Regions:
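Flexible, small-/acidic-enriched active-site or ligand-binding loops
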Residues: 340-393
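N-terminal helix-loop segment corresponding to the beta1-alpha1 unit
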Residues: 1-188, 370, 376-399
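Mid-domain beta-loop-alpha active-site segment that forms a flexible
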Residues: 165-180, 199-207, 251, 255
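Conserved PLP cofactor-binding pocket of PLP-dependent enzymes
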Residues: 308-332
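Oxidoreductase and adenylate-handling cofactor-binding alpha/beta cores
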Residues: 145, 172-193, 205, 209-216, ...
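Conserved Rossmann-fold dehydrogenase catalytic segment
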Residues: 127, 156-166, 187-203, 223-229, ...
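Aromatic-enriched alpha-helical interface/lid elements that frame and gate functional surfaces
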Residues: 233-310, 314
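Short Gly/Pro-enriched turn/cap motifs at secondary-structure boundaries
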Residues: 58, 224-229, 235-236, 345-351, ...
Length: 399
């Protein structure tokens, strides 16, 4: 789909490389520029005492890319990036704006070299405002600053960190979408543009329903416990064999009678305390207690059949071990085989990129590269002579 699109990725860690990997899975040619020593995420498992050749965290964001190592602290290294950008379609970076400007790698500088360039800047907080040059990571910019962390705290609880790269990869999707939209425009007009994505803005968008309520009414409801829900049947419950599951109640009175039948409490269908939304809200704790007792009389397998028979919208609360064996994950194409970096033809299971294109090659295009694996190849494609390439390696400008 994106075959023929050239992407220069000047980025480390996860959010921007994740966007680059989505584009690569979709067919773009992605060249990753790494600092001497490589992207720090290459060391993810070594920091916890392992020395794996395959690094599933790094590979997930970098499979199929080319890698060049350039010392961008040197003017000659910065010049090499400018050469690479001249015939690129996309420049993707998560370097802070101030550093890019000092290096002459900001949008205004690069668009003079390539007016059709789609330049995607992925930062913590955006390109304008007092915090534009502040370092950003997902737990700070996406999770904490946005209010998402606060909204997820149960009453009386404390803030807790989100899982690895949750906000990063959400922002990867946003950046990839923005890049694709700008590529369509560039194809129509012949002119590129600046695409601005940030962890902060994406975090605000993900909680946009609550933020919309806050902006409109000046307040928002706090996160309540199971027995305090406004819609108590939209909740989490536990089975006799200690399996948790969620129920999502539809609008109106659609689900109350079916749920009563599931737990064999048909007499409650017409009980005035519970037979309308207002009554259930006023008696939330009692509703939850009744359903807890009813659901707790069944093992998950038996209860699943009863819920399905009544067309209740529900889902199990799965562990990642459960997900890794879930047939629906494979049927949806959400788990794919990634070529091993060992180069022996073996593969291992890894998450797919977020969108499926039936009939298209939308999966991994190869293993993740070793640091600088393609440096000489890329320099040669820029027209550099063999002697020039050797000199660049000898000087430490590239590796």
């Amino acid at each position: 789909m994106l075959e023929g699109i050239k992407v220069v990725e000047y980025a480390t860690y996860m959010a921007a490389p994740g966007a680059g990997c989505i584009l690569r899975d979709w067919g773009a040619d992605v060249t990753k520029i790494e600092p001497p020593g490589g992207d720090p995420i290459r060391l993810f498992f070594r920091t916890i005492g392992t020395d794996l050749q395959d690094n599933p965290v790094f590979d997930f964001d970098n499979r199929g890319k080319k890698s060049v190592v350039i010392d961008t602290s040197k003017p000659e290294g910065q010049g090499l990036i400018r050469e690479m950008v001249k015939d690129a379609d996309v420049f993707l970076t998560n370097v802070r704006p101030g550093g890019l400007t000092r290096s002459g790698l900001d949008y205004e500088s690069l668009k003079t070299l390539n007016p059709k360039l789609v330049y995607c800047s992925l930062t913590g907080y955006g390109l304008e405002g007092p915090d534009a040059d502040r370092p950003g990571f997902d737990i700070a910019s996406f999770w904490s600053r946005t209010g998402v962390a606060n909204l997820t705290i149960p009453k009386g609880g404390e803030p807790f960190p989100l899982r690895t790269a949750f906000g990063d990869h959400t922002t990867s999707i946003a950046a990839a979408a923005g890049i694709c939209a700008a590529l369509v425009e560039a194809g129509r007009t012949g002119k590129g543009r600046l695409v601005e994505a940030s962890l902060f803005r994406t975090g605000l968008y993900t909680m946009g329903s609550d933020l919309a309520i806050q902006l409109f009414f000046g307040r928002v409801a706090s996160t309540k416990g199971r027995g305090e829900q406004n819609v108590p049947i939209s909740n989490f419950f536990q089975t006799r064999d200690d399996k948790w599951f969620c129920i999502v109640a539809r609008q109106g009175e659609t689900d109350w009678a079916p749920l009563c039948r599931v737990v064999s409490r048909e007499e409650l269908i017409t009980d005035p305390r519970f037979n309308n939304a207002k009554g259930r809200r006023a008696n939330s704790a009692e509703v939850v207690a009744i359903l807890d007792a009813g659901f707790g009389a069944y093992d998950m397998a038996d209860l699943a059949a009863r819920l399905d028979a009544e067309s209740i919208a529900w889902a199990p609360v799965q562990t990642l071990a459960d997900v890794s064996k879930d047939p629906q994950a494979f049927a949806a194409g959400a788990i794919v085989q990634t070529p091993s970096a060992k180069g022996d033809g073996t593969t291992y299971a890894s998450p797919a990129s977020p969108v499926r294109f039936p009939g298209a090659d939308d999966g991994p295009k190869g293993p993740s590269p070793t640091p600088g694996q393609h440096t000489a190849e890329v320099l040669a494609s820029l027209g550099r002579s063999e002697a020039d390439i050797k000199a660049l390696f000898a000087s430490g400008i590239v590796a």
